[in-house]
Amino acid sequence: MNKFATLAVFISVCLAVGSCNYGGQHAGHGYGHHRSISSYGQRGDGSAAAASSAAAAGGNDQRPVEIVAGPRYGGSEQLRPILLDSGYQGGHNEYGRGHGNIGHLVGGGSYGGHIAGGNHGGNYGGHQRGYGRPRWSVQPAGTTLLYPGQNSYRRYASPPEYTKVVLPVRAAPPVAKLYLPENNYGSHGGYHNEGPKY
């Protein structure tokens, strides 16, 4: 345990010194540095294990991770990362001073995607415009089931609507046959008496 703690502290110090040097080299120039991980877990500059062990040991270098769901088959849609830093000094500003610790997972195609992480500084391609920029992105609406059959993710859909059929209204048959008496029923006379005549 002591070896692991010592190694984690050493790696945290190396990362802190490296991030300070990075900020001093690129301050005010408007150039961004982009480190990426391919979908198979190979990091460009070889510090993936260092960052993960420092985060596991509770170091100060905590990087938020954003998951952006992309199209499942085919990656024709270009997805942009969402800025996760708060305030005006961090992230992709046009003055080139701040650097934000951003890690995001961009999905595209059927094999997952890639993770692009760490220290984007300066003018990120010249597309960001300062303080009025939105900190969110608009994703297409739809119901997509991630990893079907492997976990408890649910698909949300609208409740079913049933078609309404208007049935014709017609008179119902009588419930019982009523007895209708003849005209001479209950008269006070003989058998053929037709009643009083005036």
From Swiss-Prot:
Family recorded in the similarity comment: Belongs to the chorion protein S19 family.
Function comment: Chorion membrane (egg shell) protein; plays a role in protecting the egg from the environment.
Top-level lineage group: Eukaryota
Pfam families in UniProt: Chorion_2
The protein's name in its UniProt record: Chorion protein S19
This protein's record includes keyword Secreted: yes
Location of this chain's protein in the cell: Secreted
Gene: Cp19
Keywords for this protein: Secreted, Signal
Main location: secreted
GO BP, sorted A to Z: chorion-containing eggshell formation
